[in-house]
Amino acid sequence: MDEKDLATQPEEAGQDPRLPGPHEDPRRQERAEAQAKKGPLAPDAQGKRLGQGPPKAGGRLLSLKGDRAFQRLRKGRAGRGRFVSVKWLPAPEARVGIVVSKKVGKAVVRNKVKRRLREILRRLHLPKAHILLVASPEAREAGFAELFQDVVRALRKSGLIQ
């Protein structure tokens, strides 16, 4: 690198020329606020916004473990949506099991659906219960907002949330 390539003006102290300044795009904050108002997090009947709950267990959901836990859930209360079906039983702590069969697609697609369902459940105010979510093959085509609304609908039908 030659000396002629270097800037001749000294940089102002504390400013990085690679980072945009706050003055460069005045509409940036407006667009971010407008985008935050949209989406599946609309208020419910009581005016409480779904999805605004604190994350569970430091942001992670506790998983259902073992065959027995899944077998017990067969006797639980059920609800069905377009993309998921839900079964649940009251329990001393909130635990979640997510089932995505190979009918949904290859591993990458199944993992994407599982990540979305985990994130949706993490955002909801869930009571203490063991919950089983079973994704239908149509879940692979659903966007996050559609999946969110469908999970809420199925949980309401099952009686887990109001």
Curated annotation (Swiss-Prot):
Domain of life: Bacteria
Keywords for the protein's UniProt record, in alphabetical order: Endonuclease, Hydrolase, Nuclease, RNA-binding, tRNA processing
Major enzyme class: hydrolase
UniProt biased composition (Basic and acidic residues): 21-36
GO biological process: tRNA 5'-leader removal
One Gene Ontology MF term: ribonuclease P activity
Region described as Disordered: 1-62
InterPro entries per the UniProt record, alphabetical: Ribosomal_Su5_D2-typ_SF (IPR020568), Ribsml_uS5_D2-typ_fold_subgr (IPR014721), RNase_P (IPR000100), RNase_P_CS (IPR020539)
Miscellaneous information on this protein: The open reading frame (ORF) for this protein entirely encompasses the ORF for the 50S ribosomal protein L34 (rpmH). The two start codons are separated by four nucleotides.
Summary of subunit composition and partner proteins: Consists of a catalytic RNA component (M1 or rnpB) and a protein subunit.
Function comment: RNaseP catalyzes the removal of the 5'-leader sequence from pre-tRNA to produce the mature 5'-terminus. It can also cleave other RNA substrates such as 4.5S RNA. The protein component plays an auxiliary but essential role in vivo by binding to the 5'-leader sequence and broadening the substrate specificity of the ribozyme.
UniProt record similarity statement: Belongs to the RnpA family.
Name of this protein: Ribonuclease P protein component
Native source organism of the sequence: Thermus aquaticus
